[in-house]
Amino acid sequence: MAEHGFEAWWPYQKLAVHGFNMEVLRRFREIWTIRRDLGDRLLADRPDVFVGVDAPDFNLGLEARLKAEGIKTVHFVSPSIWAWRGGRIHKIHRSVDHMLCLFPFEPKLYHDHGIAATFVGHPLADIIPLQTSKQAVREKLALPRDYPVFGMLPGSRQGELAMMADFIIAGDNAKF
């Protein structure tokens, strides 16, 4: 976004944590301070709307604060309340004016709880094909037909990569 003229108030790496683990605990004070300071800054600037992108453990609290002060809030990437921690729907109701959903079944879950929601689709849906030819992939990667293929997708967060690095390296030499 910085390449497109947006100003970053904090480097995104400071918030690139996942879940609730030791990394988050070690950085809790810093993350909490960023969220508090961001809220203070937004309340002083009074934007027409705040759009929180994913990161519900960070954004929902911030959105609740902004919404309580009369700032419209939109959340992009619905938390997976249909899979786990469904009780978050109540916090979402207090925090979000409108939820933008990646999956077509999600808006109904929100509508049933009085929350405006719109299915917007997944950003990768038009990029990743629904069907692929295994043979074409094997040819492109020059893999023999009977060669086992294993995909490991560790994510992009530094903490996740560090946690899984030994496993990834060991997997490179694994025999299946």
Question: What do these predicted ranges mean?
Answer:
Residues 1-137, 153-161:
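Active-site and donor-binding regions of nucleotide-sugar-utilizing enzymes
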Residues 139-176:
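Active-site donor-nucleotide binding/catalytic segment of nucleotide-sugar enzymes
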